[in-house]
Regions:
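Hydrophobic alpha-helical transmembrane segments
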Residues: 21-26, 63, 98-103, 135-136, ...
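Membrane-interface helix/loop boundary segments of multi-pass membrane proteins
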Residues: 14, 148-173, 205-212
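Hydrophobic core of alpha-helical transmembrane segments in multi-pass integral membrane proteins
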Residues: 25-36, 69-75, 106-114, 270-285
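Functionally important transmembrane alpha-helices
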Residues: 34-37, 192-254
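Small-polar-interrupted transmembrane alpha-helices in polytopic inner-membrane proteins
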Residues: 112, 142, 146, 166-183, ...
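C-terminal membrane module of polytopic membrane proteins
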Residues: 226-294
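Membrane-interface helix caps and helix-loop-helix hairpins in membrane proteins
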Residues: 121-128, 181-190
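Juxtamembrane helix-loop-helix connectors linking adjacent transmembrane helices
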Residues: 2-8, 40-60, 82-151, 158-163, ...
Length: 294
C-alpha cells in the first residue's frame, strides 16, 4: 500500500529544493493565515455571537473552514502543479475509505475515554445540551477541519518533503511542525505536547501506508468531534460548550485524565499513540518484506 504514496512522490516533476521545500512552506503559512483571517468578515456577515464562534456552531466557522479547504486545494494545485489525486484524494472507494477512517477514529477516542473512565480519573455527567441541528452543524465543520489540517501536513507537505529528505526525516519534521501550531493552546503540558507530536507521527505513518487522505481526514475529524462534543473532554486545551456528556477530571489524577488539556495530555493517549504507530510500522515493514520476496 505504501506504493500509492510513493507514486505521489515519484510523480512530482520538480527537482529544485527551493520549490520542494521553501515554496510549500510559504504556501502553507499563507493558507493558515488566510484561514485565521477569513473568520472575521464571516462573523460579521452571519452575525454570529461569540458563544457560537467559540462553540464551533456558528455559520462563520463552517463556511470559513470549507472555503479554507477549497482555497488550499486551489493554491496547491496551481502553485505546485499537483493534482487532487497527488494530494491524496483518491477517486476509488471514497465512501468506504472515509467510513474506515471514521471507524478507526471513533475506536481510538472511545478506547482512551473508557480506559480513563475505568481508572476513575474522570467523572461523567450526562447533559445532552446540544440541539440536533447544532450537533450536525458542528460535525460538518469538523469534517472540513479534519481534511483541512490533513491536506496541509500529509497531503501537501509530506510528498514534497519526502522527495528531498526522505520519508523518515519528513515524518519527524512534519510532526514537529504539527506540534508547533498547537503551542498557543491553553493548559498545554509536556505530556500534551508529546502526545500532539505522537499524533502527528501516527497520522503520517497511516498516510504513508495508505496514501489515502479521506481515511486520515476522517480519523482526525471523528477524534476531535467525539472528544469534544460526545464525551465532553477538552479538545487540545479548549473547553467545549455543547456536548452529550461532560468528562470532568478528578483532582490528583491529571496524569491519567490529561487535566484541563483533555485526554490528549493523558498517559493513556501516549501509550495508545505509541501502540498504533508501532503497529503501522510493523505493517509497513511486513509489506516491504513481501515486496522483496516477489
Amino acid at each position: 500500500m505504501t506504493n500509492k504514496f510513493q507514486t505521489y512522490v515519484d510523480s512530482i516533476q520538480s527537482k529544485s529544493k527551493l520549490k520542494l521545500l521553501l515554496v510549500p512552506i510559504l504556501v502553507t503559512i499563507l493558507i493558515i493565515i488566510l484561514n485565521q483571517l477569513l473568520i472575521i468578515p464571516l462573523v460579521l456577515f452571519f452575525n454570529d455571537s461569540l458563544k457560537e464562534v467559540l462553540s464551533f456552531s456558528g455559520s462563520s466557522n463552517l463556511v470559513s473552514e470549507a472555503i479554507s479547504l477549497f482555497l488550499a486545494i486551489f493554491l496547491m494545485t496551481k502553485i505546485s502543479k499537483l493534482s487532487t489525486e497527488q494530494l491524496g484524494f483518491s477517486k476509488d472507494n471514497i465512501a468506504t475509505s472515509y467510513l474506515k477512517g471514521a471507524f478507526f477514529g471513533t475506536l481510538q477516542v472511545l478506547s482512551v475515554f473508557l480506559i480513563i473512565f475505568c481508572l476513575n480519573a474522570i467523572d461523567i455527567y450526562y447533559v445532552a445540551n446540544i440541539p440536533i441541528l447544532i450537533f450536525i452543524k458542528i460535525l460538518i465543520f469538523f469534517v472540513f477541519q479534519g481534511l483541512f489540517e490533513e491536506i496541509l501536513f500529509r497531503g501537501y507537505l509530506m510528498p514534497m518533503f519526502t522527495k528531498v529528505i526522505g520519508i523518515k526525516f519528513t515524518i519527524i519534521l512534519l510532526s514537529f511542525l504539527f506540534t508547533c501550531i498547537h503551542l498557543l493552546n491553553p493548559n498545554l503540558s509536556m505530556i500534551g505536547l508529546t502526545n500532539v507530536f505522537l499524533a502527528g507521527v501516527t497520522f503520517s505513518l497511516i498516510y504513508y501506508y495508505t496514501g489515502n487522505l479521506w481515511l486520515v481526514g476522517a480519523m482526525h475529524t471523528l477524534w476531535n468531534f467525539i472528544l469534544g462534543f460526545v464525551v465532553g473532554s477538552y479538545v487540545s486545551g479548549i473547553p467545549t460548550i455543547y456536548s452529550i456528556f461532560f468528562s470532568v477530571p478528578v483532582e490528583g489524577k491529571n496524569l491519567i485524565s490529561g487535566g484541563e488539556f483533555g485526554f490528549e495530555a493523558s498517559i493513556v493517549e501516549t501509550i495508545l499513540e505509541l501502540g498504533v504507530s508501532l503497529f503501522v510500522i510493523y505493517l509497513i515493514k511486513k509489506e516491504k518484506k513481501g515486496e522483496n520476496y516477489e
